[in-house]
Amino acid sequence: MLGVRCLLRSVRFCSSAPFPKHKPSAKLSVRDALGAQNASGERIKIQGWIRSVRSQKEVLFLHVNDGSSLESLQVVADSGLDSRELNFGSSVEVQGQLIKSPSKRQNVELKAEKIKVIGNCDAKDFPIKYKERHPLEYLRQYPHFRCRTNVLGSILRIRSEATAAIHSFFKDSGFVHIHTPIITSNDSEGAGELFQLEPSGKLKVPEENFFNVPAFLTVSGQLHLEVMSGAFTQVFTFGPTFRAENSQSRRHLAEFYMIEAEISFVDSLQDLMQVIEELFKATTMMVLSKCPEDVELCHKFIAPGQKDRLEHMLKNNFLIISYTEAVEILKQASQNFTFTPEWGADLRTEHEKYLVKHCGNIPVFVINYPLTLKPFYMRDNEDGPQHTVAAVDLLVPGVGELFGGGLREERYHFLEERLARSGLTEVYQWYLDLRRFGSVPHGGFGMGFERYLQCILGVDNIKDVIPFPRFPHSCLL
């Protein structure tokens, strides 16, 4: 009997009987409200932050934004409404009817029936001021508030769309996404610019390592991707990387995001360069199609003329020159460089930017670098006295180096000799073992995500394209 009563009770709760006739307002994002095809008085609810307040004799106008779009939704309310807390920056919930707007400035507007202030904002003390276009340098002081400005909001939406576009490109191309570790015992760059990890508090034990070996924040996921490329022919990762570089330049951060890929069974740089160019162009085209208003805002207020420069990059095939040719171009330049170009020396930022300009402001691949300039895993070209490796960098306008990559040394004895000369054989024995068991020709590349955003948007300082920039002597929040 008890079972029957429980069954009847459950049937009652699962009944298809209608709810009370009161129809709640449909919650919409500002973007969806602005894009509504039928603005015939549907009752809706939006939540967001006030971007502007304008009071007239009989009508009160608000513009409310929730971050879903650059454009705000105009809210029209009776002027008799208590507006004391309806300040710039206050968070609100608005219910009302979505109607066609009589103004040519917007297609729809929300006729408010109820406005609820969720959180008041004292506009006098708020560091972001109404109708004031703050310099990006000023906004860096307020990482907890700068996302509320139009420019940073646009950059962060573009960042989100670019992330999705990159994942989409790799998925459509048959790549497997690998989560490479943040904590590692390897230094894939060989530069020694590492953040070492130590436990704090009671776990801190002198003369011992938590992992029994020194551990660091990763500088690259490449070596772990190479492990995976022995089982999957195409792999990629997208995540944070860390460099303990004491640099305050406009291109460097201590924490940034990297897109890295490894491809098995490739034996030419041309194969890698084709994927790199396709990735850059496909991602950029997707960003331009998904958030044109945000890109337009950045180009208008941050980098006038960037739209034309970007279109120039997209419509032209990327160029290819060798490192040796690059050095000759620099030597013949009329420009005086701070660092004298010479064969065997690394290309500096001033050199990279000159080479791009020399090539008509089209992205240019520089290939076949001196062996001494690149890490131990780059494939030896066996090309005589100059001794180069099959490495490639992509240089782009305004930024310089954007991609770096190359063919990996898959031949056991070549790699063994390189490691022995560097005294790294014991540390990288596992890496050597990959060449003993089913090794294949393979190669890969990495792209700095923040530099990519700088490139397409024309943002001069890398600190302005990441939500919370980390750099020497600064770790706000």
Swiss-Prot record:
It is an enzyme of class 6 (ligase). Pfam families: tRNA-synt_2, tRNA_anti-codon. It comes from the Eukaryota. Its EC number is 6.1.1.22. Residues 1-14 form a transit peptide. The modification N6-acetyllysine is found at residue 353. Its main location: mitochondrion. It catalyses: tRNA(Asn) + L-asparagine + ATP = L-asparaginyl-tRNA(Asn) + AMP + diphosphate + H(+). It is found in: Mitochondrion matrix; Mitochondrion. Transmembrane segments: none annotated. GO terms for molecular function: asparagine-tRNA ligase activity; ATP binding; nucleic acid binding. GO terms for biological process: asparaginyl-tRNA aminoacylation. Keywords: Acetylation, Aminoacyl-tRNA synthetase, ATP-binding, Deafness, Disease variant, Leigh syndrome, Ligase, Mitochondrion, Non-syndromic deafness, Nucleotide-binding, Primary mitochondrial disease, Protein biosynthesis, Transit peptide. GO terms for cellular component: cytosol; mitochondrial matrix; mitochondrion; nucleoplasm. Homodimer. Belongs to the class-II aminoacyl-tRNA synthetase family. HAMAP family: Asn_tRNA_synth. It is linked to Combined oxidative phosphorylation deficiency 24: An autosomal recessive mitochondrial disorder with wide phenotypic variability. Some patients have a milder form affecting only skeletal muscle, whereas others may have a more severe disorder, reminiscent of Alpers syndrome. Alpers syndrome is a progressive neurodegenerative disorder that presents in infancy or early childhood and is characterized by diffuse degeneration of cerebral gray matter. This is Asparaginyl-tRNA synthetase. It comes from Homo sapiens (Human). The gene is NARS2.
